[in-house]
Structures are given as C-alpha cells and as structure tokens.
Amino acid sequence: MITAYIDFKSLDCFLAISPILELADDCETPVSWKPYRSTKRALPTQVANESITQTHHRVRAESERRLQQHYARLRGLDIDPSRGQIDTSAALGWLANLEGDSSSFVSRLFTAHWIEH
C-alpha cells in the first residue's frame, strides 16, 4: 500500500497525484490518502536592507514558484497559484471520513480546485 499525505490547496500535492496513481497502478497496490493541513508561506518581497536570511527565503520561494509553474506547463496545465490560498479544510474533513478507495474523490477534488475553479 502507498500512503500519501495530501492537502488539496498544495500545488506540489496536485502535481504529484498523477505520478502516485500511475505508480499504484504499475505496482497493483492501493493508495491510502491521508489529509494533511499545510501552511502556505506568503511570497516574500525584497526590502532595502534585507538580511541574508530574508534574501534566502525570498529567492527560495520564487524558485519554488517557478519550478511548480514549469512542471505544470510540462503537463499542459494552466495553474493559478493564488488557488493555494483557499481554505480546503472541509474537503480534508470529508477525506478523513471516507472508507475504501478514495482515489477518484481525491483526483476529482484536486482537478476541481486547481483546474476547473
């Protein structure tokens, strides 16, 4: 069994769904989807006298955002990064209470949140 901890508002999690499902299919094993509440850090802005730590956080956040957009484009997805700020707690609660194979629920909800909004 593959155990995957996910948060519907996480773009990284959304981009990982297809590979996880493909791996599970290739290995003929089920996926146990576990809700996980992540916190989205705001994209830091450059300030006049920023410290080395502030510079590091800003550059890293910008790099993460560009990398996510790159992988989304490779998969032909048009992603609005602001969707990561929307609260998905209710959906995580539903997931926690589902029994059996919840892969279709997870896949549909991620698509609805990130693509069809």
Describe every region a protein language model picked out.
Residues 1-20:
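Local sequence-structure signature of Cys/Sec-based thiol-disulfide redox active-site neighborhoods
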Residues 17-113:
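Structural alpha/beta surface segment adjacent to cysteine/selenocysteine redox centers
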